[in-house]
């Protein structure tokens, strides 16, 4: 059994006066944070909850959420991170599936699950006793499940991903070995803490001794102001956030040394603009099952390897496989990864867990290739692949071309049935101006082989996305969605 000292308690012992957290105008040192977490742990200890039980956490980004995470760890509870964008029914499924013993939430959500399980807010938690009635966990078992996050469920029911303390620790260490670590680093988080890209920064904070600058949500003006005021050095972003920063700034703020870009391959035009304006974008590839990034492209390769997700983090491995055969450079296949940051498995789903692994390698379900130097290029989801007349067509490739048009704001491509070819691509576009179809075909003609051209264009008000804001291409072909297009 491999153990480590409780991360927050050890960090508060080693560097007590370092700033741990900044939220709006308030700051907490690691000593302050540990003291407040100890008080909160005492309150949680007055409940009937037992070590090893799973508890739901449904909150917006806020210092209280940070403290609840650490307090739950201190009492040995497994935390189920709930997406506040989900419907009540979707959250209920996850709480029942994980066998949650209680839910910690905010007053705005408290009534949603009343009567289903014990529900606590900061206002309704018992007052602290004179002493803890439960033992504080001074050590973490690295093989123990720390957090459970449900996959987005782009196909079928979502599954609970079991992430261990060891997964989170090795993710943080691999990230530091890849991106470097400085004493003055400050990481801004405006992504939701219920997603791995947000939550992982909390663990990096206590493992590195680094300040987290927390925002409740992404507001471009507030984020820019915060970067300048607090001399932020690192920020986690997705495409939409990076796009807004680029639209507001002509050059990168001087303190920023890393914009960690996740959430899927970025359009080449966006990466090129980032380069021209001096934004140090680290394009990355990862998922809930890998506890955030597992492949990252360092900025020094961003020109010659534009569009690549990079190479595996230190201690991680990558291969491209087609069936049982390892693919050669530039040959397309399924992306498979391995490392100490890869999940324990899917909770209560032995068959799904077994199907997800092949001799210790995680089968990601994504299609990609590596070049002759081992740089990864992510093409698409295997489930979204279009096979037209025997040719493989990747929707993301077509979407990237369509997004280069100045009036196309969002693009989604899916395969629709065709008597002659089996399937043909159909494009769904959100635009800010009417675009003649001949313009779109001319754009495709200059960038794509003819068999990749969309057979039809559909103009819609919005694209279907799940709670994680991921495009749900399979919903594009539904009759209801086709009927709403024009």
UniProtKB/Swiss-Prot annotation:
Classification via PROSITE patterns: AMP_BINDING (PS00455)
Gene Ontology biological-process entries: fatty acid metabolic process; menaquinone biosynthetic process
EC main group: ligase
This protein's UniProt keywords: ATP-binding, Ligase, Menaquinone biosynthesis, Nucleotide-binding
Entries under CDD domains matching the protein: OSB_CoA_lg
GO molecular function term, any single one: medium-chain fatty acid-CoA ligase activity
Statement: the UniProt record of this protein carries the keyword Ligase: yes
A Pfam family recorded for this sequence: AMP-binding
Pathway linked to the protein: Quinol/quinone metabolism; 1,4-dihydroxy-2-naphthoate biosynthesis; 1,4-dihydroxy-2-naphthoate from chorismate: step 5/7; Quinol/quinone metabolism; menaquinone biosynthesis
Keyword Nucleotide-binding found: yes
Enzyme nomenclature, EC number: 6.2.1.26
Record field: catalytic activity: 2-succinylbenzoate + ATP + CoA = 2-succinylbenzoyl-CoA + AMP + diphosphate
Protein family membership: Belongs to the ATP-dependent AMP-binding enzyme family. MenE subfamily.
HAMAP family: MenE (MF_00731)
Job description of the protein: Converts 2-succinylbenzoate (OSB) to 2-succinylbenzoyl-CoA (OSB-CoA).
NCBIfam families per the UniProt record, alphabetical: menE, PRK03640.1
Name under which the protein is recorded: 2-succinylbenzoate--CoA ligase
Organism: Bacillus pumilus (strain SAFR-032)
Upper classification of the organism: Bacteria, Bacillati, Bacillota, Bacilli, Bacillales
């Amino acid at each position: 059994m491999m153990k480590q000292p409780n991360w927050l308690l050890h960090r508060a012992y080693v560097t007590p006066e370092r700033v741990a957290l900044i939220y709006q105008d308030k700051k907490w040192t690691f000593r302050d944070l540990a003291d407040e977490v100890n008080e909160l742990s005492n309150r949680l200890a007055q409940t009937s909850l037992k070590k090893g039980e799973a508890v739901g956490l449904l909150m917006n980004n806020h210092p209280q959420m940070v403290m609840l995470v650490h307090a739950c760890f201190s009492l040995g509870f497994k935390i189920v991170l709930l997406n506040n964008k989900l419907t009540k029914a979707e959250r209920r499924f996850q709480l029942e599936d994980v066998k949650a013993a209680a839910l910690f939430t905010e007053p705005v959500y408290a009534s949603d699950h009343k009567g289903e399980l014990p529900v606590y807010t900061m206002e309704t938690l018992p007052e602290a006793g004179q002493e803890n009635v439960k033992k504080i966990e001074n050590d973490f078992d690295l093989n123990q499940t720390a957090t459970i996050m449900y996959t987005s469920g782009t196909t079928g029911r979502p599954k609970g991903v079991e992430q261990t303390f060891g997964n989170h620790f090795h993710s943080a260490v691999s990230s530091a070995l890849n991106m470097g670590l400085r004493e003055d680093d400050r990481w801004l988080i405006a992504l939701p803490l219920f997603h791995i890209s947000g939550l992982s920064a909390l663990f990096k904070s206590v493992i590195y001794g680094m300040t987290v600058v927390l925002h409740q949500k992404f507001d471009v003006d507030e984020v820019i102001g915060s970067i300048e005021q607090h001399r932020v050095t690192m920020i986690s972003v997705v495409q939409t956030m990076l796009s807004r920063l680029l639209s507001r700034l002509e050059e990168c703020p001087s303190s920023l040394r890393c914009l960690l870009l996740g959430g899927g391959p970025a359009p080449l035009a966006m990466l090129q603009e980032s380069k021209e304006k001096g934004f140090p974008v680290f394009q990355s590839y990862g998922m809930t099952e890998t506890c955030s990034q597992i492949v990252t492209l360092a900025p020094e390769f961003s020109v010659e390897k534009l569009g690549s997700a990079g190479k595996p983090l230190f201690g991680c491995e990558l291969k491209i496989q087609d069936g049982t055969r390892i693919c050669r450079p530039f040959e397309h296949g399924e992306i498979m990864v391995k490392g100490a940051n890869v999940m324990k498995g899917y909770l209560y789903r032995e068959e799904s867990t077994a199907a997800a692994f092949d001799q210790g390698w995680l089968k990601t379900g994504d299609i990609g290739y590596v070049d002759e130097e081992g740089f990864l290029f992510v093409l698409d989801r295997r489930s979204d692949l279009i096979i037209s007349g025997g040719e493989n067509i990747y929707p993301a490739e077509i979407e990237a071309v369509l997004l280069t048009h100045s009036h196309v704001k969002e693009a989604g491509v899916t395969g629709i049935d065709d008597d002659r070819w089996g399937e043909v691509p159909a494009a769904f576009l959100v635009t800010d101006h009417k675009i003649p179809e001949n313009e779109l075909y001319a754009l495709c003609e200059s960038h794509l082989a003819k068999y990749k051209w969309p057979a039809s264009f559909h103009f819609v008000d919005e694209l279907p996305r799940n709670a994680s804001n991921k495009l749900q291409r399979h919903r594009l072909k539904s009759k209801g969605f086709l009927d709403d297009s024009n």
